[in-house]
Amino acid sequence: MQVPVGSRLVLALAFVLVWGSSVQGYPARRARYQWVRCKPNGFFANCIEEKGPQFDLIDESNNIGPPMNNPVLMEGPSKDFISNYDDYGSGSGSGSGSGSGSGSGSGSGFLGDMEWEYQPTDESNIVYFNYKPFDRILTEQNQDQPEDDFII
């Protein structure tokens, strides 16, 4: 039995389209670095797009191992962790500055508050931070004033 030429063409075209759509394509093996260099001049950016030479990419599909294959990640936390928390906020120094303003208080500020809120706890030679703030004792002067005394 003879198959018409038109049917063969349609069959071949359908085969090529189906087979071609299932192929994902070959990944790119060549790459090029690109960057933008700008020299601002007043209100203008004066940018130039530059391209580096092309180079071959290495095949990284074989370099990817199973999850958690890295022995450093599997060890867990280090046993010889040294905390610099004891040195935090201590020391001496000098400085200069200028400004104007007025205020009152005992001098406790941001660093003192941080030391109250983040107290280290030592469990089996590993330093963890307890992020639950302690109850603060507000014994400083002018801390417990009612809102009626505020001047807006």
UniProtKB/Swiss-Prot annotation:
Q: What residue spans carry the region label 10 X 2 AA tandem repeats of G-S?
A: 89-108
Q: Cite the propeptide residues by number.
A: 26-74
Signal peptide range equals: 1-25
Task: Spans of sequence repeats, please give.
Answer: 89-90, 91-92, 93-94, 95-96, 97-98, 99-100, 101-102, 103-104, 105-106, 107-108
Q: Which cysteines are joined by disulfide bonds?
A: 38-47
Q: What the protein does?
A: Plays a role in formation of mast cell secretory granules and mediates storage of various compounds in secretory vesicles. Required for storage of some proteases in both connective tissue and mucosal mast cells and for storage of granzyme B in T-lymphocytes. Plays a role in localizing neutrophil elastase in azurophil granules of neutrophils. Mediates processing of MMP2. Plays a role in cytotoxic cell granule-mediated apoptosis by forming a complex with granzyme B which is delivered to cells by perforin to induce apoptosis.
Q: What is this protein called?
A: Serglycin
Q: Which organism is it from?
A: Mus musculus
